[in-house]
Amino acid sequence: MKKAIIIGSGIGGIATALRLRSMNYDVTVFENNDFPGGKLTSFDLGHYRFDAGPSLLTMPHFIDELFDLFNENPRDHFNYKKKDISCKYFWDDGTKLSAYSDKIKFTKEIENILGVKQSIVSAYLLKAKKKYELTKRMFLEQSLHKLKTYFTKDLLNGVFNIFSFQINKTLNQVNASELKEPHLVQLFNRFATYNGSSPYKTPGMMTLVQHLEQEYGTFVSDKGMQNITNSLYNLALRQGVDFKFNNYVSEILVSNKIATGIKVGDKTYESDIVISNMDVVPTYRNLLKNHYQPEKILNQERSSSALIFYWGVKKEFKNLDLHNIFFSKDYKNEFQTIFENNTISADPTIYINITSKDVKGDAPINCENWFVMINSPNDSGQDWDNMIDQVKSNVIKKINKKLKVNIED
C-alpha cells in the first residue's frame, strides 16, 4: 500500500487525508498542536462558546461529498440548514438591508431600499455567474500544476472569453460602473476581503466571489463551525487515517526534486506522497529552507489580516442575525489605511457573527456570543497592544451608536 503524509490537520489537511484514504493510501497526518482543525476550532469563555476561525459556511455539499466517498450518510454526523438571510448590512446614514439567499427576494430588497432596479442587479449577478462557470473547472476542480490542464476545453473556453473576466479593471471600477449606487457598490466591494484583498486593487474578475454566496446560499451547522472539523476528523479515524499530534515537522525530505518524507525531531518518516497543509511561505522558508525558493511568489504583497474580539453580550438583539456588517463611512480610506499605512482605520467596517442566533447552546438565555472582526494589516511590527486598545474603543462606540445601546452594561 502506498503511503501519504499530510503536514497539518487543518480542514484542508483532513479533507486531503480522506480523499487519499479513499484511493487506498496509508495516510498519516502530522500536527504540531494537540488537537485537529487548525484555524477551524472553537473555545469556551465562561458559558459562551465561540468559533475561533472561519465563520461563514457555503457549499456544504463538498463536506457531504467526503462522507459519500465511504458510503456513509452525512446526516448521521454533520447537519446544517440554509439561512434565509445571508447577511444584514448597516450603513452610517441609517440605511439597512437584508441580503436574502433567494435571489428574487434579494434583488427586490435592493430595489425597495436602494432604488436600483432588479434587472440591473440580476444582470450583474448573471455576469458573475458566467465568470464562475467559465473558470471553476480550471481553477477550482483541476490542478494548475499538471500540464494536461492546459490542453483542455475548459482552458480554451477561458481564453476565448478572457475579456469578459474584466481583469483590466479593479473590482471597485466594475461595481461602480455597473451598479453605481454607493451603498450597493460598497456591499459588493466587500467580497474582496474574502481573500484579504482591497477592492481598489483586486481585478474585476473577483465579482465571482459573491456568486458562491448568492447562488448557493449561506448555511449554519447545528453545532457550530467546529462540527465540520469534528465530524470529518472522526470520519478519518473510522477510515484508518493515523493522526500524530504534538509532532513538529522540521523538514520535508527531498531527493532528486521529489519529496520522499519528513523529519520530526531525530526521526524520519518516508512516504510516496508528502502534502503540506501549511501556508506556502512557512512551508518553503521552514520546511524546504535548503531547496529552491520561488522568491517571486514568496515575496508577493501580503494580504490583509483580521483582528477579532470575542464578547459575551448580556442582551439579545432582534435586529441582528448570524452575519452582520456595519460599514465604514469612507471605504476607500479604510483600505488605504490597511494596505498603505499598515494600521487600522479609526472608522473600521465591523463584522459581527452571532452563532447563538441558531445554535442556542452557544450562549446563556437572553444573551449572545459576539465574534467581532475588523479588517487589519498583516503583522509588520506594529504596536499591537496600543492599536488593539484604540480599535476596541472605536468599535464599541460605533456599535453603541448604531444599535442605540451600551453593550458594556
PLM feature spans:
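Conserved flavin/dinucleotide-binding core of flavoenzymes
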Residues: 322-323, 334-409
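Mid-domain catalytic core of redox enzymes
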Residues: 250-364
